[in-house]
Structures are given as C-alpha cells and as structure tokens.
Regions:
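A short, N-terminal "cap"/entry segment at the start of jelly-roll beta-barrel domains
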Residues: 1-67, 71, 80
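Double-stranded beta-helix
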Residues: 2-13, 71, 124-150
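Short strand-coil-strand connectors
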Residues: 64, 101-105
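Short, solvent-exposed loop/turn positions at domain surfaces
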Residues: 79-81, 87, 103, 111
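Short, conserved beta-strand element in jelly-roll/cupin
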Residues: 83-100
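Short acidic-glycine-tyrosine-enriched beta hairpin
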Residues: 104-119
Length: 150
C-alpha cells in the first residue's frame, strides 16, 4: 500500500509517494527537536489572571511573530483595557465561556468558538455571570490575519 506525503512551504507544495509511512524510522535523535505536550487543564498551569483583575495570561510557547498564552480568568473582569499594538489576537475558548468587550462591539465566546481581535483594538475580558472554570488559548500573531474558511 503506497503512502502519500504532502510537503508545503511558502504557498508551494510537493507530493511524495512512499512504500512505507514516514513514521517508520530506524532512529531519530536530537537535543533541540522534540514533540512537546502541555495539559492546559492542569492546576499547575496557573495564569495570574485566574483570580486577579490585574492578572495576565500565562505565556506557554513563543516563536518569532507568534506567542501562545493560556488564560483562566474566572472571578473578576480585566481591571484594565488592553490595546495590542504589535499583534492580532486569536482567542480560542476551550472550556467555559468569556465575554469580550471591545470598541468594535461585545462578543460572548463559548467552548469551541474563536474570536479574532485585530491589532490596535481596545478590549477586555469579563467572566460570565456565575463564574465557573474558563480555559482560553490566546494566540498573539503578526497583524493582518484574515479568515480563509467560509
């Protein structure tokens, strides 16, 4: 049975057909390259915004032009408005919900939904009535993100 591998870079692609899957390797060694997992539900992943109005999300991964933060705000609205002048912010609600007040309007996110806040737009997060556990992934990325599906 042939295996197909599609390689993509800078808008180009190359399709390879192999006799064996690319996961069938004799050995893979590196001190720098590895798969990493992070359980964002772990209590040890504790951003300062969990129970503090002035708290902020916890940065967990970073590369040039992108940063991934975990937010678990549950008791108090942000005590300040934030205007990110460097990045667009893509907010993914993994668990619970969050109200986002922005100068472009107010959006309520529920688990499974995402919100793109463009660079330079003032915003703040407000937990919904009743609080509860909220887990959000915030992706800070180079500005001018555009939606490509539907």
């Amino acid at each position: 049975m042939p295996y197909t591998e599609k390689i993509t870079w800078q808008g180009r692609s190359l399709t390879l057909t192999r006799d064996e899957p690319p996961t069938k390797v004799v050995e893979a060694r590196s001190d720098e390259v590895r798969l990493e997992t992070l359980d964002i539900t772990d209590a040890a992943v504790r951003p300062s915004n969990l129970d503090a109005a002035e708290g902020t999300p916890l940065p967990v991964f970073q590369a040039p032009g992108v940063r991934v933060d975990v937010s678990k705000r549950k008791t108090a609205p942000m005590g300040f408005w934030h205007r990110n002048m460097e990045h667009d912010e893509l907010i993914f609600c993994n668990k619970g919900g969050m109200i986002w007040e922005t100068e472009l309007g107010t959006v309520t996110l529920r688990a499974g939904q995402m919100l793109l806040i463009p660079q330079g737009v003032a915003h703040r997060a407000v937990p919904p009535e009743g609080g509860g556990e909220n887990i959000l992934i915030e992706l800070k990325m180079a500005p001018m993100a555009r939606r490509v599906f539907p």
